Amino acid sequence: MIPGEYQLADGDIQANVGRKTVKLEVVNTGDRPIQVGSHYHFFETNHALKFDRLQARGMRLNVPSGNAVRFEPGEAKEVELVEFGGNKVIYGFHNEIDGKL
């Protein structure tokens, strides 16, 4: 092995297998772009984003870690959300949950 070398398995990486997902139509009703990161609790995003928030409770974007989705003003797009893993305790963001889901 060479220092710093990666030894990766063959095949694709499967993320979020077996977790609940939901697809939602999201519209940016604001006058500024809004960007949402991969692990942001989607339920607590900027309120200029209009979508079914109850379906987004306990969910985040189903995109690779470190990625984000940008919503331009007036833009509507469908996103796929995936449930948070672990013990389902959420703190921070807009402090709308601050505890167990």
UniProtKB/Swiss-Prot annotation:
One GO biological process this protein is involved in is:
urea catabolic process
Q: Which pathway does UniProt place it in?
A: Nitrogen metabolism; urea degradation; CO(2) and NH(3) from urea (urease route): step 1/1
Q: According to the UniProt entry, what is the EC number of this protein? A: 3.5.1.5
A GO molecular function annotation here is: urease activity
Localization annotation: Cytoplasm
| Cysteines engaged in disulfide bonds, as pairs | none
What the record says about family reads:
Belongs to the urease beta subunit family.
Q: What is this protein called?
A: Urease subunit beta
Q: Which organism is it from?
A: Actinobacillus pleuropneumoniae serotype 5b (strain L20)
Organism classification, top ranks? Bacteria, Pseudomonadati, Pseudomonadota, Gammaproteobacteria, Pasteurellales
